[in-house]
Each structure stands twice: as C-alpha cells, then as structure tokens.
C-alpha cells in the first residue's frame, strides 16, 4: 500500500509511527485528569476493552461531542431499521466519552479512537473488524483511513465540512488530497460550498447531503 502513496503520505506514516508513544503519554494525562478510568488508555493504542459483538458491525468515527451526538442520531435510526445490526462509535475526547456513556443506545459500544499510528490502527481493526466505516464531519486521520481501505472496508464521509483556509492548504498537495478522498465511496457535505471544495480537491462524487 505505501509504495503507491504520495511522498507526503509515506513520510507522515513513518513520522506517526515514531511519535505515537509520545502522543500516547500526552493523551494519558489529558484523559485521566478528566475522570476516565486509566484502564481505557489502552484503547488509544488500539487495544480494545470490550469484546466485538457478533454479526454485522458498523463503525462511526467522530472527533468530539458535536460529531458524536450527530452519530447517535443516525445510529438510532439505523438500529430501528435493522434490529440485527450492531454499532461501534469512536471519539477522541474525555468529554465525548462521558456524554456517550449516558446516551449509548442498545447494541452500541464506545471506544477511544486509536492514535493515528499504523500499528495502533491495525490492532484496532484486527479486533473490531467493522463491515462499514463512517467518518463524521472533518476528522480525517490518514493512517486510519488508509488502513481501513486496505482491508476492503467501505468508507463514507458524512456531514463533511472544510473551511476555505483548509481547502486552500489541501490544494497545495493535490496528490495527497486525492489519495485520501478517493478512499470514500460516499461523501455527503453540509453545504454547496463544502461540496465544491471537495470536488476541486479531486472528490468528484462529493455532494450536498442530509444534515445530521
């Protein structure tokens, strides 16, 4: 997989591997200071603290509180339509974990997202083996996306948003932008401006979708 990647992505993958232990140490302080059980710190290394449920599993990745709540609305609708489906939601903040703990519907599990190291992401995917992956808004971690795609797991980006400044930055590395955005089979944007930005970055299939 790495041989076909733009140089910038290959460099990022190598750097992420090197700095992952330091990033985990930094995260440890933030999470434990906000009342999270220290046993859950291993989730940031991709080590699960819950078993994978049987059957089809849909994974939602959300950055923080707002994205997590948006995910829950969609999960509730999908769960009502398909009683056999199970769900996993990942997020990166202690606040989102506390809120989700009070609001998780049946058949839904929360874990902290693995830090964006190839090793940590592979551990995570080895355990959870999701059948589909849904990323919410703007949380696009390259290794998480690339490792998921490498396993043939369909990816969707919903409620996508991107600022003018971020779009301009991505436009300076067009091969990298295309390499990441092309992994998504479905990209639904919050508004026309965002859809135009994504299309200009190489995601011709990006379109305005329902706002979560």
Model regions and ranges:
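Short hydrophobic helices that act as membrane-entry/anchoring signals
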Residues: 2-31, 178, 182
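Active-site and donor-binding regions of nucleotide-sugar-utilizing enzymes
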Residues: 24-212
């Amino acid at each position: 997989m790495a041989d076909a990647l733009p140089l910038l992505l290959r460099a990022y993958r190598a750097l992420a591997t090197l700095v992952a232990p330091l990033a985990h140490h930094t995260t440890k302080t933030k999470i434990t200071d906000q009342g999270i059980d220290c046993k859950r710190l291993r989730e940031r290394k991709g080590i699960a603290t819950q078993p994978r449920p049987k059957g089809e599993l849909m994974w939602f990745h959300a950055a923080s509180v707002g994205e997590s709540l948006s995910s829950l609305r969609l999960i509730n609708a999908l769960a009502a339509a398909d009683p056999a489906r199970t769900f996993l939601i990942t997020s990166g903040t202690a606040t989102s974990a506390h809120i989700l703990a009070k609001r998780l519907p049946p058949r839904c599990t929360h874990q902290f997202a693995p830090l964006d190291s190839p090793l940590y992401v592979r551990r995570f995917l080895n355990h959870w083996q999701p059948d589909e992956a849904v990323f919410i808004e703007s949380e696009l971690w390259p290794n998480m996306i690339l490792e998921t795609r490498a396993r043939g797991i369909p990816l969707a980006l919903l409620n996508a948003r991107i600022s003018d400044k971020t779009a301009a930055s991505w436009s300076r590395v067009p091969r990298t932008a295309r390499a990441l955005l092309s992994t998504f089979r479905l990209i639904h944007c919050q508004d026309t401006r965002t859809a135009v930005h994504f299309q200009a970055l190489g995601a011709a299939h990006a379109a305005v979708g329902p706002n979560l």
